[in-house]
Amino acid sequence: MTNIRKTHPLMKIINSSFIDLPAPSNISSWWNFGSLLGVCLIIQILTGLFLAMHYTSDTMTAFSSVTHICRDVNYGWLIRYLHANGASMFFICLFLHVGRGLYYGSYMFMETWNIGVLLLFAVMATAFMGYVLPWGQMSFWGATVITNLLSAIPYIGSDLVQWIWGGFSVDKATLTRFFAFHFILPFVIAALAGVHLLFLHETGSNNPSGLSSDADKIPFHPYYTIKDILGALLLALVLTCLVLFSPDLLGDPDNYTPANPLNTPPHIKPEWYFLFAYAILRSIPNKLGGVLALVLSILILAFIPLLHTSKQRSMMFRPLSQCLFWILVADLLTLTWIGGQPVEHPFIIIGQLASILYFSLLLVIMPITSLIENNMLKW
């Protein structure tokens, strides 16, 4: 009898994606983050679904409905903190996944990479709207500040902001539509992730050496299924420890105060995973310039394949580029730290220097260094 997984139309797709998929024999644990992001997305959709059963998207009751979830719903506190900290785990995996792509030259798969950049924007939009929903002080003021940035767009800016708000300020209409979008976007992300995988499987995975692995493939199952399960268990361990021991470690205390339009918090700042972009935004004194820099800080990833000047794909055999890559990582950590600091000396100048270094490394220094490495190897 013919094996059902190779003949059944639905099973065939699963089989060719997760069972009989030919995978390079030398991919390291850095290749685990794709599956971990899938696990994170499933956790977020499931916990979000149960939260939505008890949440009300009305300015009068949103804050108290979240309180009700934590106090009165069976294991509501657990679901709420799994969802909040699950977002942090999601972004940790995302940043490591993108970093892996930059280091090993995975961006040379253009379609896969560009859909990945689109996914990054979609996840950031979803996280931003989700942060508004508890309707605490930082939710309200974060929404006000970030949506207000669109007013920097010439001619249509102020109309666009009012259109998004559904009025003349962040209010009930804004909260309701943010809840609607926050609910639907994860399913759009899941669909995009499917397309991301589709394009990846057209070419096959990259590997640490950046060389073709066609001559040395192994089946995905059992080798990489067991490896991915180990990764998922470690992710679950970290998330569980975070949720059960210090669930508010990554949150903002201001969000435990109900939203008050008449009282501005002393330091308005987004969640930790947006701080690097927020620091770049704040480092430019001009409003439109800041908004453009903010968008470009992420959009620059789409131009990385065009800036690849090396004859080698991966950084595995390129020590100079490796050094610059880790300087870039340190720079991003510096920007994240600066984003959480008040706008005063010396943080302003540190933020400006870190922002200049960020764009200089990606646009100028790394491509030139790659050319130097080519010459050193007489290529």
Swiss-Prot record:
It is found in: Mitochondrion inner membrane. The cytochrome bc1 complex contains 11 subunits: 3 respiratory subunits (MT-CYB, CYC1 and UQCRFS1), 2 core proteins (UQCRC1 and UQCRC2) and 6 low-molecular weight proteins (UQCRH/QCR6, UQCRB/QCR7, UQCRQ/QCR8, UQCR10/QCR9, UQCR11/QCR10 and a cleavage product of UQCRFS1). This cytochrome bc1 complex then forms a dimer. Heme b b566 binds at H97, H196. The lineage of its organism: Eukaryota, Metazoa, Chordata, Craniata, Vertebrata. Pfam families: Cytochrom_B_C (PF00032), Cytochrome_B (PF00033). One of its GO terms (biological process) is mitochondrial electron transport, ubiquinol to cytochrome c. GO terms for molecular function: metal ion binding; ubiquinol-cytochrome-c reductase activity. This is Cytochrome b. Changing A232V: In strain: Isolate LAF1511. Gene3D superfamilies: Cytochrome Bc1 Complex, Chain C (1.20.810.10). Belongs to the cytochrome b family. Heme b b562 binds at H83, H182. InterPro entries: Cyt_b/b6_C, Cyt_b/b6_C_sf, Cyt_b/b6_N, Cytb/b6-like_sf, Cytochrome_b, Cytochrome_b_C_euk/bac, Cytochrome_b_N_euk/bac, Di-haem_cyt_TM. A ubiquinone binds at H201. Its cofactor is heme b. It comes from Cryptotis mexicana (Mexican small-eared shrew). Its main location: mitochondrion. Heme 1 (or BL or b562) is low-potential and absorbs at about 562 nm, and heme 2 (or BH or b566) is high-potential and absorbs at about 566 nm. Changing A236V: In strain: Isolate LAF1511. It is a multi-pass membrane protein. Binds 2 heme b groups non-covalently. Keywords: Electron transport, Heme, Iron, Membrane, Metal-binding, Mitochondrion, Mitochondrion inner membrane, Respiratory chain, Transmembrane, Transmembrane helix, Transport, Ubiquinone. Component of the ubiquinol-cytochrome c reductase complex (complex III or cytochrome b-c1 complex) that is part of the mitochondrial respiratory chain. The b-c1 complex mediates electron transfer from ubiquinol to cytochrome c. Contributes to the generation of a proton gradient across the mitochondrial membrane that is then used for ATP synthesis. The chain crosses the membrane at residues 33-53, 77-98, 113-133, 178-198, 226-246, 288-308, 320-340, 347-367. GO terms for cellular component: mitochondrial inner membrane; respiratory chain complex III.
